[in-house]
Regions:
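Conserved acidic residues
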Residues: 79
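A short, aliphatic-rich alpha-helical micro-motif
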Residues: 74-75
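Redox-cofactor binding/interface segments in oxidoreductases and associated redox assembly factors
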Residues: 83-84, 103
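Short glycine-rich anion-binding loops that position phosphate/pyrophosphate groups of nucleotides
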Residues: 16, 86-89
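Conserved active-site segments centered on acidic
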Residues: 1-71
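Phosphate-binding/catalytic loops
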Residues: 89-156
Length: 156
């Protein structure tokens, strides 16, 4: 049985909202199964305050996350890359190498318009959709590990 946890990298363009929310959720529900990080192809240099706020509402603290470039992870031991870019007009980053790849598109809440409450609700909606997707991913991975005695991403 493989003792090393698979390394999951969650990518989007700016690494300011979606990828951090996804990283926080996946760490929260499956930190025992995966080492989780996030990065972007064109990092914004900050984590959006509304992303921090809506994650705190569900008991997940991402306030110490930092915006990172995907280059920091090249040549590393990444086993799975999950892209979370949502719009067809976005240049979703491609991570080179032999990795498991998933794309789960989510609207970018950083582009939300309206009142403060409307913008906050957009962040909450994206967070709640991400929570469902990443909880399901974690549950499937946990079931596989229990049944097969190894992580699915280490099942080569």
């Amino acid at each position: 049985m493989e003792n090393t946890k698979p390394n999951v990298l969650i990518l989007c363009t700016g690494n300011s909202c979606r990828s951090h929310m996804a990283e926080g959720i996946l760490r929260h529900v499956a930190g025992d199964l995966f080492d989780v990080n996030s990065a972007g192809s064109n990092p914004a240099g900050y984590v959006h305050p509304l992303a921090i706020q809506v994650m705190k509402e569900i008991g997940i603290d991402i306030s110490r996350h930092t915006s990172k470039h995907m280059k920091e992870f090249l040549g590393g031991n990444i086993t799975t890359v999950i892209t979370v870019c949502g719009n067809a007009d976005q240049a979703c980053p491609m991570f080179p190498g032999q990795v498991n790849r998933y794309h789960w598109g989510f609207e970018d809440p950083a582009h939300a318009k309206g009142t403060d409450e409307e913008m906050l609700n957009t962040f909450r909606q994206v967070r709640d959709r991400m929570k469902l997707v990443f909880e399901a991913y974690a549950a499937g991975s946990r079931e596989f590990a229990t049944t097969h005695g190894k992580h699915p991403n280490n099942a080569a």
